[in-house]
A protein has these predicted regions:
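Aromatic side chains
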Residues: 39, 48, 95, 121, ...
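Short polar/charged helix/loop
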Residues: 131
Length: 183
């Protein structure tokens, strides 16, 4: 399936969600994540700070930030820097996403688990992002377990057309499904 078609379809589905449906979905997805060995064993986790149309990460970050070391990406040109998450040290950055302040950069090799946002995922772990390639460039240098999270309708049955630079996730979690990619 073509990425632009997927983006249009998913955007339309997201626009129909109520705030209550969004909150229930986020709770369900992150409850599932908390039960996974990859999460339980990880201490250094790269998260994302959600956009309004994405599965919200705010409550999850608040719940676990005292027990796990979280990091957030910050746009730097065409790449993403990784910085420690401190709720009081965020500013509105590129694409109107809250990003960490400071210069305390972390190497991707030091991250044990990466929670990856996307527009959609297929059952092979392939993902459709927003089209800029930020996450693909960053994920290419990582050996960490990569977990994609989203709404049920973001997990599609059709195979996603991929390019040579696309980096799949290892696990996809939605409200009703957990898909583990075979390597």
């Amino acid at each position: 399936m073509k990425k632009d078609d997927i983006r249009r379809t998913v955007r339309a589905r997201k626009s129909l969600l109520t705030e209550n449906e969004k909150a229930e979905a986020a709770q369900s997805v992150f409850d599932r994540l908390e039960q996974m060995a990859a999460f339980m064993m990880a201490d250094r986790i790269l998260m994302y700070h959600s956009l309004p149309d994405e599965l919200s990460t705010r409550d999850f970050l608040g719940k676990w930030s005292g027990r796990k070391h979280f990091f957030l990406p910050r746009v730097n040109g065409v790449n993403l820097d990784i910085l420690p998450y401190e709720q009081t040290r965020l500013h509105l950055g590129a694409f109107e996403i809250e990003e960490p302040d400071g210069n305390d950069l972390t190497d991707i090799a030091d991250i044990e688990l990466i929670i990856v946002p996307a527009v959609a995922y297929d059952r092979h772990g392939n993902r459709v992002g927003r089209g800029k390639g930020y996450y693909d460039r960053m994920l290419a240098g990582s050996r960490a377990t990569k977990v994609g999270v989203g709404y049920d309708f973001q997990l599609i049955d059709d195979a996603i057309d991929t390019d040579s630079h696309d980096v799949p996730v290892d696990i996809v979690i939605t409200q009703s499904h957990t898909v583990i990619r075979r390597r």
